[in-house]
């Protein structure tokens, strides 16, 4: 039995974005990728006349020290992303699931 090769962080990010594209397609979105490696959003998604700017983030598995429960940790949006209405789409690399982050407020994360 061969060992799986460990992926570098940039390759994990590439995988997350491609899983995000297919997940969004499955959920009725038309998807357009950011052609550069920088910018406030990775994807632009259209559905039912609504445009959504999306930044895909790979969630990091964590173990809660007090409870022992597993949870995923992700980062916050930047001020520029908040002002532009960018939504974070989290990718769980363990089970390859995706979900939109429920942002606390439009002005603050």
Where are these predicted regions, by residue range?
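Acidic-basic catalytic patches of nuclease active cores, encompassing PD-(D/E)XK
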Residues: 1-34
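Short, surface-exposed beta-edge/turn micro-motifs
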Residues: 40-41, 50-51, 85-87
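Conserved catalytic cores of phosphodiester-cleaving nucleases, focusing on short active-site segments
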Residues: 20, 24, 43-45, 49-60
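Active-site-adjacent loop/helix micro-motif of nuclease/hydrolase catalytic cores
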Residues: 60-75
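Domain-level recognition of nuclease-like catalytic cores that cleave nucleotide substrates
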Residues: 82-109
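Ligand-binding grooves and catalytic loops that recognize ribose/phosphate and carbohydrate rings
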Residues: 71-85
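Structural signal for conserved beta-strand scaffold positions within catalytic alpha/beta enzyme cores
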Residues: 33, 55, 90-92
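Active-site metal-binding core of divalent-cation-utilizing nuclease and nuclease-like domains
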Residues: 26, 30-40, 44-48
């Amino acid at each position: 039995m061969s060992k799986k090769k460990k992926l570098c962080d940039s390759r994990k990010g590439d995988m997350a974005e491609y899983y995000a594209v297919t997940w969004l397609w499955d959920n009725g979105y038309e998807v357009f990728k950011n052609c550069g490696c920088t910018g406030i959003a990775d994807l632009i998604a259209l559905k039912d006349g609504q445009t959504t700017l999306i930044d895909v983030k790979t969630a990091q598995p964590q173990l809660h020290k007090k409870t022992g429960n597993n949870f995923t940790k992700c980062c916050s949006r930047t001020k520029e992303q908040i002002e532009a209405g960018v939504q974070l789409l989290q990718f769980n690399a363990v089970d390859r699931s995706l979900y939109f982050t429920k942002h606390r407020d439009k002005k603050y994360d």
